[in-house]
């Protein structure tokens, strides 16, 4: 008897996705390069419709045609090696789905190469971590649409469900579109986390709040317009005590790790010419956090103001909340502008409002305000920037004074706020009809004869700036 779908790679994500698929009524074949993980899967899957295999040949032959194979192996060379091993065993029309944390450019390359072998290829972003993989992730599949249609029922079944019952999956677009959108999703996630961390720093360093008060603040915020998974778990984190009944978070070394997708997002923005300042500052913030020894030494050598606050703490806490929400809006505005430009350049025809909808559940950046993004693009499909949507425009108009005050207070007290600072600078730059770039153009023309355009007449000009 043949199985309906196969999963290669039985680390935690592959294993949990296989169980998720099986729980929706599908029969699943599994294979792992090391047989020990396959044996463990068998032991843990008693009573489930999971079919173990111990060679690629056995695995491929166990699947109904056209074969549907989900690859959950390490991104990069391991994925290429697995595909190369599979190719001689596959038939025309079989479907490979790469659910790994893959660079979208690799997906474009693989899509093109496999098309020549008549193999359908889907690059699919998977968000939600190991729990999401088991209970329902947000899925971002890209590739041939006809191939997607053949696996749509399975993906729809295993995806997270929003409160209105809609599955958090949709066809994203051709070739690398799915993994590209997942990359930007991860970049936005970096910014969300950095902005929340800066809010915590202000509460702790400036307002002197206890971990209990910080936890309660995030729980209160999660009941309003900031409602989101990351705000929710932040409240939980501050309630967790260690073996000494002290806040565990305060014992964690302040060096933030990363897997590189935030960096990919920033590099791509540079290539596109898109200002992705908030996400990029969030990547840099992780870099500077990683040089702990240098920072400790610098703290003994470099002086600055000592944080102190003698104002109304309740009032300032509300300003932090507003600063966080406005900065979040600016960050998403940048991320969606990046996806809009990439869609145009690659002819992906991304439906930006639909992307917001599939992030409502299952993924790390799930948040209440994603519905507002969907509404914005429904009202104006050609919207250039989320800040120009009436809802978001009203919010940033009302909240900008709070953000300015938070940034200024942070600077005056030596509390770093790279994300908040980048947000207000982006907002002010974006709304500026005139920027001092005219001087930069004059300088470029002065030393390099790069020429310039003028406001008052047509043409391209060069000036001899000093007389010989």
Curated annotation (Swiss-Prot):
One Pfam match: NAD_binding_2
Coiled coil: none
Binding positions for substrate per the UniProt entry: 101, 127-129, 185-186, 190, 259, 286, 444, 450
EC supergroup of this enzyme: oxidoreductase
Keyword Lyase carried by entry: no
Keyword Signal: no
Catalytic activity annotation: 6-phospho-D-gluconate + NADP(+) = D-ribulose 5-phosphate + CO2 + NADPH
Gene Ontology MF: a single term: phosphogluconate dehydrogenase (decarboxylating) activity
InterPro entries named in the record: 6-PGluconate_DH-like_C_sf, 6PGD_dom2, 6PGDH_C, 6PGDH_Gnd/GntZ, 6PGDH_NADP-bd, 6PGdom_BS, NAD(P)-bd_dom_sf, Pgluconate_DH
Active site residues per record: 182, 189
GO terms of biological process kind: D-gluconate metabolic process; organic acid catabolic process; pentose-phosphate shunt
Pathway info: Carbohydrate degradation; pentose phosphate pathway; D-ribulose 5-phosphate from D-glucose 6-phosphate (oxidative stage): step 3/3
Keywords in alphabetical order: Gluconate utilization, NADP, Oxidoreductase, Pentose shunt
Subunit structure: Homodimer.
Purpose of the protein: Catalyzes the oxidative decarboxylation of 6-phosphogluconate to ribulose 5-phosphate and CO(2), with concomitant reduction of NADP to NADPH.
Protein name: 6-phosphogluconate dehydrogenase, decarboxylating
Classification of source organism: Bacteria, Bacillati, Bacillota, Bacilli, Bacillales
């Amino acid at each position: 008897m043949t199985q309906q779908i196969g999963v290669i790679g039985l680390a935690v994500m592959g294993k949990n996705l296989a169980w998720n698929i099986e729980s929706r009524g599908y029969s699943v074949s599994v294979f792992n390069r090391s047989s020990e993980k396959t044996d463990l899967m068998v032991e843990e899957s008693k009573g489930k419709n999971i079919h173990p295999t111990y060679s690629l040949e056995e695995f491929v032959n166990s699947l109904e045609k056209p074969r549907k194979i989900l690859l959950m192996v390490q991104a990069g060379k391991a994925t290429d090696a697995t595909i190369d091993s599979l190719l001689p065993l596959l038939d025309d029309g079989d479907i490979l789905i790469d659910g790994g944390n893959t660079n979208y450019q690799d997906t474009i390359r693989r899509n093109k190469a496999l098309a020549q072998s008549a193999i359908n290829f889907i690059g699919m972003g998977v968000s939600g971590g190991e729990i999401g993989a088991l209970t329902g992730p947000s899925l971002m599949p890209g590739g041939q649409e006809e191939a997607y249609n053949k696996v749509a029922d399975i993906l729809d079944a295993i995806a997270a469900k929003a409160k209105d019952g809609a599955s958090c999956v949709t066809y994203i677009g051709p070739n690398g579109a799915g993994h590209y959108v997942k990359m930007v999703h991860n970049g936005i996630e970096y910014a969300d986390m950095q902005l929340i961390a800066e809010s915590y720093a202000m509460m702790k360093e400036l307002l002197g709040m206890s971990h209990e008060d910080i936890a309660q603040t995030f729980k209160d915020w999660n009941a309003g317009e900031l409602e989101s998974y990351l705000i929710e778990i932040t409240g939980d984190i501050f309630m967790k005590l260690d073996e000494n009944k002290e806040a565990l978070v305060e014992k964690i070394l302040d060096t933030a790790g990363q897997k590189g997708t935030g960096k990919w997002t920033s590099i791509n923005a540079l290539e596109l010419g898109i200002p992705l300042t908030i996400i990029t500052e969030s990547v840099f913030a992780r870099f500077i956090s990683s040089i702990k020894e240098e920072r400790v030494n610098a703290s003994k050598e470099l002086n600055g103001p000592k944080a102190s606050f003698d104002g109304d703490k309740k009032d300032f806490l509300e300003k932090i909340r507003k600063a966080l929400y406005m900065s979040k809006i600016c960050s998403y505005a940048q991320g969606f502008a990046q996806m809009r430009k990439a869609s145009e350049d690659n002819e992906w025809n991304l439906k930006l409002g639909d992307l917001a909808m599939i992030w409502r559940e299952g993924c790390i950046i799930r948040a209440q305000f994603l519905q507002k993004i969907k509404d914005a693009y429904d009202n104006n499909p050609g919207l250039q920037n989320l800040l120009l949507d009436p809802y978001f425009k009203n919010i940033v108009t009302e909240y900008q004074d709070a953000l300015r005050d938070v940034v200024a207070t942070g600077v005056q007290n030596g509390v770093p706020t790279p994300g908040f600072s980048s947000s207000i600078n982006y907002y002010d730059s974006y709304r500026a009809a005139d920027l001092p770039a005219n001087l930069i153009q004059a300088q470029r023309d002065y030393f390099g004869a790069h020429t310039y355009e003028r406001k008052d007449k047509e043409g391209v000009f060069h000036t001899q700036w000093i007389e010989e």
